[in-house]
């Protein structure tokens, strides 16, 4: 990234045509079983470091240009590798990610939204079948709030399916980090 900057390449082009396009290839290879989680994490970390190098050169509208997204693993679930990967991919897709961490109760997600009312998307993760009810409860708690019409909810995690996402009232489901970034962009565009 630094070499490209030193050679006079446009920072936005480096991000969009170099890094984001490369991560799309990584995502496809992951989906097709050509690479696995360790390689995906290496690529995501490289992406994150590259974005850090680029940040000073990018105008504020290109970092976070797709808006804010709240990210959390639901109450009772302590898994963060998948969530972190999703966070890096979504951030690299032009979102400002507010990562609440793991074992996050619905009340904390709602409180975070109230502190950041310009948030467009809430992304929730559950990686255990035993925390699927917690995911359902969190979506239900958000649905009961007056701001539900102003946001999109996306869900994911190993045991989650499109059917379950539909059943609990989520707006979107993604099975992996690469498709999560694509889904986030699609949901944000629907709200524009």
Give the predicted meaning of each segment.
Residues 1-61:
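Long amphipathic alpha-helical segments
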């Amino acid at each position: 990234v630094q070499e490209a900057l030193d050679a006079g390449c446009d920072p936005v082009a480096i991000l969009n045509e170099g890094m984001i396009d490369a991560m799309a290839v990584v995502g496809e290879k992951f989906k097709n079983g050509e690479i696995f989680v360790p390689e995906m994490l290496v690529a995501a970390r490289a992406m994150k470091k590259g974005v850090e190098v680029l940040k000073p050169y990018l105008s504020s509208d290109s970092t976070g240009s797709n808006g804010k997204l709240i990210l959390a693993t639901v109450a009772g679930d302590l898994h963060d590798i998948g969530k972190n990967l999703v966070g890096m991919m979504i951030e690299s897709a032009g979102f400002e990610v507010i990562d609440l961490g793991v074992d996050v109760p619905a009340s904390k997600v709602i409180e975070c939204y109230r502190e950041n009312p310009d948030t467009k998307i809430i992304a929730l993760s559950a990686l255990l079948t035993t925390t699927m009810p917690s995911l359902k409860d969190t979506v239900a708690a958000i649905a009961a709030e007056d701001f539900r019409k102003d946001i999109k909810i996306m869900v994911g995690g190993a045991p989650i399916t499109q059917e379950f996402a539909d059943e609990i009232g989520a707006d979107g489901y993604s099975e992996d980090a690469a498709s999560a970034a694509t889904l986030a962009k699609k949901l944000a565009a629907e709200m524009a």
